[in-house]
Amino acid sequence: LFAGNLNAETKTYKMVFVPASEKGDESDYTSLIAITEKLTGFNIDTIKVTDYNAAVEAMRAGRAHIAWYGGKTYVKAAEIANAEAFAAGVRPGEKDAGYYTYFVVKKDSKLKEFKDVKGKILSLNTIGSTSGDLIPQVELNKINLSIKNKDHFNKVFYAGSHDACLLAVLNNQSDVCG
């Protein structure tokens, strides 16, 4: 969680979020909101935005006080919206916050090794997503592939969400989802 523009007089804070699933509502964050309200004593109202840049802009403009960002977006928010980290999500049974990035293909795909993605159609989540854009690009760079190099992929596109990225593979619009 990241905060900006907080003060002691305010009792209701606005939390900006980018939907984490196709449902597209704050139910993805219900537990987080309840815990934050309980621990701080503040009321939390939510603001839904469609992308990470809009979340940062809401905080920069003072329309939001709290946000749930990935690592890449946090760096931007810290620079332009004075965001400060005050909590991190940790999965049950794990010691540290971290990211998992998966490259997904169909079960019957001929892609058996990571290097086989060269020349294929790649779908990613959204621009600015740490787990669905930045980390996949880092992993591709480790095997000397770049989404910016037209010779490396037949096509690269942003599907718009994790769910949409997976659906692109299932619907044969993409060979691999990162």
Identify what each model region corresponds to.
Residues 46-48, 66-68, 87, 123, ...:
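Structural recognition of the beta-strand scaffold that forms the well-ordered cores
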Residues 10-11, 15-37, 49, 72, ...:
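Bilobed "Venus flytrap"/periplasmic-binding protein-like clamshell domains
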Residues 77-90:
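Ligand-binding "clamshell"
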Residues 30-70:
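N-terminal, post-signal-peptide region of Sec/Tat-exported proteins
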Residues 71-77:
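Acidic/His-rich segments in extracytoplasmic proteins that coordinate ligands and/or metal ions
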Residues 2-9:
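Sec/Tat signal peptide C-region and signal peptidase I cleavage site
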Residues 53-67, 80-81, 115, 161-178:
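Short helices/loops that flank or line small-molecule/ion binding pockets
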